[in-house]
Amino acid sequence: MPTNLHAWNALQQHHDAIRDHQMADWFAENGADRVRQFSLEAAGLYLDYSKNRITPQTMQLLLQLADEAGVPARRDAMFAGEHINATEDRAALHVALRATAGAGFKVDGVPVVPAIQNVLVRMRAFSEAVRSGAWTGTTGERITDVVNIGIGGSDLGPKMVCRALSHLAHDDGHSGPRMHFVSNVDGTELAEALERLDPRRTLMIVCSKTFTTLETMANAHSARQWYLDNGVAEDQLARHFVAVSTNVDAVRAFGIDPANMFEFWDWIGGRFSLWSSVGLSTALAVGFNAFADLLAGGRAMDEHFRTAPLERNMPVVLGMLGIWYRNFFNLPTSCMAPYSTSLELFPAFLQQLEMESNGKTVQLNGRRVRTHTSPVVWGTAGTNGQHAYFQMIHQGSQIVPVDFVAPLVPPRELPGHHAKLLANCFAQAEALMRGRSAEELRAAGMTDELRIAHMVFEGNRPSNTLLMEDLTPHVLGALIALYEHRTFVQGVVWNINSFDQWGVELGKILARPIESELNGAQAGSHDASTAALIARARGVLARNG
């Protein structure tokens, strides 16, 4: 366990020695050297991590901890296709999805890249057919809208990417279809999406590895009925449905031509699947060339993660800074603040990536962890967050580390807007670090001591700033892969399995009999609270038919 490692104990002592030091003092001593020492560039991303409560010794000890915890060895095992997902006895080889055609990735001794490349060829052909108008609905009309039906990784990842790259929808000379994403089993979401669409011009992508996911299949069957209710004959449905799945029999039974099924594999976790055929929605929305560039960006970050020394390794540095705050400062949350509306869904994507991966209490050896694991991850796009929760980040009783992310060139620009956006991003990070003292306020002429007390900012609040020149598919791919590997690094240090998600299973199991009871079956055995909730819901449902 990590707490037995020499570097962990050294970091505890080091934390006690520096925890009251002010970052502003370190910057005053030699800020330019500090920025040079605590900044990195890789795969089109620039990371400034100088506004953290760290010294060179801190980083030396954190990187020593990464080494002692086995980060390099576990990284190499992942790239080698070993079964690092121990509880499911699987590889976690999502990096192979973005590999070049000649790469030698194997699972259980079998090369996987040829199968991946075959799916990519089919994705290119299909997406180009839809975007060019060669693939039509049953009436011969062009597809103008695509609905992606999936949940979790089959929704959050591709939805985030499509939103981030929406400015590229016309870059290949074709007008991409409008993308809609439906995930929730709440029928309101699907109903509201469908009421705006023409079934003759709409294509459905049903994303489910097993083709049995409750929410996804409920929505898929309702979408199927929508076509039938609107005059599309059952034998014509195949022109309006494609599947992303591994279950050929279930896909065929649903009425989708297996020729229009795009496969992926059980060694790809849902939250890492946007690089696979789950990314078909991305290829349809912005063109396959953009999707290929996304893969190339992820591949560039993979190569950096695999080869860079720990002290110059961006995922390792970010991961270990997260360990520093979660386990030594005992900070329970972290904030993602992208200063780009295009990246507004990135915080939600990170919530699944980090909390589903590392929200664990059991180590690889089956023993309970003795440290905190994943923080609560949250955030929204700037500058909106400044007018919502940044008050708490600046002056609240709880310190929240922030990651600021900003493209220097906007995807779309109105005169003067982007300079204001960047100014606010940089100012927030500076204000969190510097703070504002009572002496500064008095020197500025303020004399009301009560007001001064309320206007003091303690400062010394940490942040990272990640910059990119512009938000290209390549850079977005690198950004996503950066946080994937950061999450992996932290899981290795905590000695947990970042690739399973047993925590979502129990609720699914309990929901099945409750659904039957809500539909009139005899009440089962529940605690008093759950039984009362079921009874109340049954009464209302009965009155409303």
UniProtKB/Swiss-Prot annotation:
Record flagged with keyword Cytoplasm: yes
E.C. no: 5.3.1.9
Keyword check for Cytoplasm: yes
Domain of life (superkingdom): Bacteria
A family per Pfam: PGI
Gene Ontology terms: cellular component: cytosol
Gene Ontology biological-process annotations: gluconeogenesis; glucose 6-phosphate metabolic process; glycolytic process
Keywords, comma-separated and alphabetical: Cytoplasm, Gluconeogenesis, Glycolysis, Isomerase
Gene Ontology MF terms: carbohydrate derivative binding; glucose-6-phosphate isomerase activity; monosaccharide binding
Cellular compartment(s): Cytoplasm
Biological or metabolic pathway of the protein: Carbohydrate biosynthesis; gluconeogenesis; Carbohydrate degradation; glycolysis; D-glyceraldehyde 3-phosphate and glycerone phosphate from D-glucose: step 2/4
First-level EC class: isomerase
Catalytic-site annotation from UniProt: 356 (proton donor), 387, 508
Reactions catalysed according to its record: alpha-D-glucose 6-phosphate = beta-D-fructose 6-phosphate
Family: Belongs to the GPI family.
Purpose of the protein: Catalyzes the reversible isomerization of glucose-6-phosphate to fructose-6-phosphate.
Entry protein name: Glucose-6-phosphate isomerase 1
Lineage: Bacteria, Pseudomonadati, Pseudomonadota, Betaproteobacteria, Burkholderiales
